[in-house]
Amino acid sequence: MRFLGVNLPDNKAVVVALTYLYGIGLPTARKICSSLAIDGSAKLPDLEQEQLNSIMAYIKNDIPFEGELRKSVAFSIKHLVDIKCYRGVRHRKNLPVRGQRTRTNARTRKGKVRVPIAAKKRV
């Protein structure tokens, strides 16, 4: 089912289906369902159109999600890089930002290990 520009699965509960939207996790999805008095265990196609419209309105008005949230996060990171603070420098160098060790580990952030290849001896 297409919902706010995203394909949501029909065979999952409403609470789980809402988590397919970027920026909405399980706690937020539960909060949406409880505040609108919607059964979270119901399937998405089983909901009435008014319920779907109320969920859509709630998300659009109260929660940053999808493109808006992605732009906000990207702008925040760009701002850190522009002001050249410690976190911005770490982002620019593709290193861990939150104080993790880098002598070992941090492979996901640093990328594949590059082993220098020794040059052949000339005779």
From Swiss-Prot:
One of its GO terms (biological process) is translation. Coiled coil: none annotated. GO terms for cellular component: cytosol; small ribosomal subunit. InterPro entries: Rbsml_uS13_C, Ribosomal_uS13, Ribosomal_uS13-like_H2TH, Ribosomal_uS13_bac-type, Ribosomal_uS13_CS. It comes from the Bacteria. Pfam families: Ribosomal_S13 (PF00416). Keywords: Ribonucleoprotein, Ribosomal protein, RNA-binding, rRNA-binding, tRNA-binding. GO terms for molecular function: rRNA binding; structural constituent of ribosome; tRNA binding. Located at the top of the head of the 30S subunit, it contacts several helices of the 16S rRNA. In the 70S ribosome it contacts the 23S rRNA (bridge B1a) and protein L5 of the 50S subunit (bridge B1b), connecting the 2 subunits; these bridges are implicated in subunit movement. Contacts the tRNAs in the A and P-sites. Part of the 30S ribosomal subunit. Forms a loose heterodimer with protein S19. Forms two bridges to the 50S subunit in the 70S ribosome. PANTHER family: 30S RIBOSOMAL PROTEIN S13/40S RIBOSOMAL PROTEIN S18 (PTHR10871), SMALL RIBOSOMAL SUBUNIT PROTEIN US13M (PTHR10871:SF1). Belongs to the universal ribosomal protein uS13 family. This is Small ribosomal subunit protein uS13. The lineage of its organism: Bacteria, Pseudomonadati, Pseudomonadota, Alphaproteobacteria, Rickettsiales.
